[in-house]
Amino acid sequence: MNTTISNQTPHIRIFDTTLRDGEQSPGCSMTPQQKLVMARALDELGVDIIETGFPASSHSDREAVAMMGRELRRPTLAVLSRCLQADIETSAKALETAANPRLHVFLSTSPLHREHKLRMSREQVLESVHRHVTLARGYIDDVEFSAEDATRTEEDFLAEVTRVAVAAGATTINLPDTVGFTTPEEIRGMFSRLIASVEGADKVIFSAHCHNDLGLAVANSLAAIEGGARQVECTINGIGERAGNCALEEITMALKVRGAFYNIDSAINTPRIVSTSQLLQRLVGMPVQRNKAVVGGNAFAHESGIHQHGMLRHRGTYEIMRPEDVGWESSQMVLGRHSGRAAVERRLRALGYLLEEEEVKLMFEQFKALCEKQRLVTDADLQALMQDATVQEGYRLASMTISDVGSRANALVELSDPEGNRVAETAQGNGPVDALFGALASATGVKLELDSYQVHSVGIGADARGEASLSVRHDGVEYEGTGTSKDIIEASALAWLDVANRLLRQRERGVIAGKTAAVA
């Protein structure tokens, strides 16, 4: 693809607005110190322009901008300002500490905004653009002008606004899809026509700022690049107003992966992407969904047997980029009900088990049976299956009775031991679960120190079951167990026995000698 490159910039400039537009996402506000921490990460990521805030909106933003200006000397630091003299003066003052400052002024241009928000005519909008861009340029040489709601603005008027802003001294023209309304074909054409027709367009950088209301923010930003845009405004994890903005990690990796098509890349240090994404998640408390492109937990995870088999042959069969290129350590072969025998055998081999063909077949059958009971199978589950294949089954719950004894509870449990004999024991405790665990300890001879215990519902309505999860210690080693039943007390007993039986199996095989292997 060959598109005339405005201003002959050698790469797509990444304008990150996580600290301004991104922070406007409900629940994502940051303190000045948190903004500085995030800005440092954006600097290390290689972002060209960091939009640091909206100084006229709060003292907190002014403080944050000044802090970033004193410390960050490489990237351009931008601040947002309305087309108001007081805003521009406040913004210019906030940028006094910055080595590479940019004033970013904006004004709505669409008929809807002109009539209902601004109550201004076309002529008044043009006059305001000229006056305030000129004012901004008097303070700082690098001035960006944004025509808010550009994609719903009459194109002839948008061309006139652009011409006036360029003539007044704007160095970057941003054409936002403020409400995520446009489509790739429309925005590509808009940029292409304006760059070709507006006087002075070859002297400025054209920029796209796309929102994700229809899920098209990244696609529209790529289309704008095809139309000649050479700056893209985006945020980490795509956070921002309403449905968010163009996601930095997605747009930059699209340019890198499809480099042969776009013939232009960003300067982003892509192996820093995942750590930067995770930092933002911690700072604002907004985790990304697991299937989020590039940075989601499942972005490089493979469960399907067909996919796993292909990945084992050649990773390019089902991955278009390397996880290491964005900061993940490696691809994940997730074991679950869709996994094939080859993936299970490979994982067992990695755990140190070398099996004959018949043993692999038997293990895979047991693996598939386990997958009917739980969504994912961990390494510990595989180890337990291997232990089950070579030693007798452990203790099984035959019956239990819980009763109140004054302020305390009494538990009677009857178990079947590994040889099939019945073992019955009683115990008292401070509540039914405490009594139950005491009786189980007496019956099995296994002493477990309880660290945590949780129960929750699994399923919906009449089919719901209780799942008990517990974390215990034995000889200083931490173990975890789960149990599921219609009765939560029974589920608790099964969770306790889950740990005890695995511990006993490991002991019988000589896997543990007091403190060797943990069961997870």
From Swiss-Prot:
<keyword id="KW-0464">Manganese</keyword>
<feature type="binding site">
    <location>
        <position position="21"/>
    </location>
    <ligand>
        <name>Mn(2+)</name>
    </ligand>
</feature>
<dbReference type="InterPro" id="IPR000891">
    <property type="entry name" value="PYR_CT"/>
</dbReference>
<dbReference type="InterPro" id="IPR013785">
    <property type="entry name" value="Aldolase_TIM"/>
</dbReference>
<dbReference type="GO" id="GO:0003985">
    <property type="term" value="F:acetyl-CoA C-acetyltransferase activity"/>
</dbReference>
<feature type="binding site">
    <location>
        <position position="245"/>
    </location>
    <ligand>
        <name>Mn(2+)</name>
    </ligand>
</feature>
<comment type="pathway">
    <text>Amino-acid biosynthesis; L-leucine biosynthesis; L-leucine from 3-methyl-2-oxobutanoate: step 1/4.</text>
</comment>
<dbReference type="InterPro" id="IPR036230">
    <property type="entry name" value="LeuA_allosteric_dom_sf"/>
</dbReference>
<dbReference type="InterPro" id="IPR050073">
    <property type="entry name" value="2-IPM_HCS-like"/>
</dbReference>
<comment type="function">
    <text>Catalyzes the condensation of the acetyl group of acetyl-CoA with 3-methyl-2-oxobutanoate (2-ketoisovalerate) to form 3-carboxy-3-hydroxy-4-methylpentanoate (2-isopropylmalate).</text>
</comment>
<dbReference type="InterPro" id="IPR013709">
    <property type="entry name" value="2-isopropylmalate_synth_dimer"/>
</dbReference>
<comment type="subunit">
    <text>Homodimer.</text>
</comment>
<dbReference type="GO" id="GO:0030145">
    <property type="term" value="F:manganese ion binding"/>
</dbReference>
<keyword id="KW-0808">Transferase</keyword>
<keyword id="KW-0479">Metal-binding</keyword>
<feature type="binding site">
    <location>
        <position position="211"/>
    </location>
    <ligand>
        <name>Mn(2+)</name>
    </ligand>
</feature>
<dbReference type="GO" id="GO:0009098">
    <property type="term" value="P:L-leucine biosynthetic process"/>
</dbReference>
<dbReference type="InterPro" id="IPR005671">
    <property type="entry name" value="LeuA_bact_synth"/>
</dbReference>
<keyword id="KW-0028">Amino-acid biosynthesis</keyword>
<dbReference type="GO" id="GO:0005829">
    <property type="term" value="C:cytosol"/>
</dbReference>
<protein>
    <recommendedName>
        <fullName>2-isopropylmalate synthase</fullName>
        <ecNumber>2.3.3.13</ecNumber>
    </recommendedName>
</protein>
<keyword id="KW-0432">Leucine biosynthesis</keyword>
<keyword id="KW-0963">Cytoplasm</keyword>
<dbReference type="InterPro" id="IPR002034">
    <property type="entry name" value="AIPM/Hcit_synth_CS"/>
</dbReference>
<feature type="domain" description="Pyruvate carboxyltransferase">
    <location>
        <begin position="12"/>
        <end position="274"/>
    </location>
</feature>
<feature type="binding site">
    <location>
        <position position="209"/>
    </location>
    <ligand>
        <name>Mn(2+)</name>
    </ligand>
</feature>
<dbReference type="Pfam" id="PF08502">
    <property type="entry name" value="LeuA_dimer"/>
</dbReference>
<keyword id="KW-0100">Branched-chain amino acid biosynthesis</keyword>
<dbReference type="Pfam" id="PF00682">
    <property type="entry name" value="HMGL-like"/>
</dbReference>
<comment type="similarity">
    <text>Belongs to the alpha-IPM synthase/homocitrate synthase family. LeuA type 1 subfamily.</text>
</comment>
<dbReference type="Pfam" id="PF22617">
    <property type="entry name" value="HCS_D2"/>
</dbReference>
<dbReference type="InterPro" id="IPR054691">
    <property type="entry name" value="LeuA/HCS_post-cat"/>
</dbReference>
<dbReference type="GO" id="GO:0003852">
    <property type="term" value="F:2-isopropylmalate synthase activity"/>
</dbReference>
<feature type="region of interest" description="Regulatory domain">
    <location>
        <begin position="396"/>
        <end position="520"/>
    </location>
</feature>
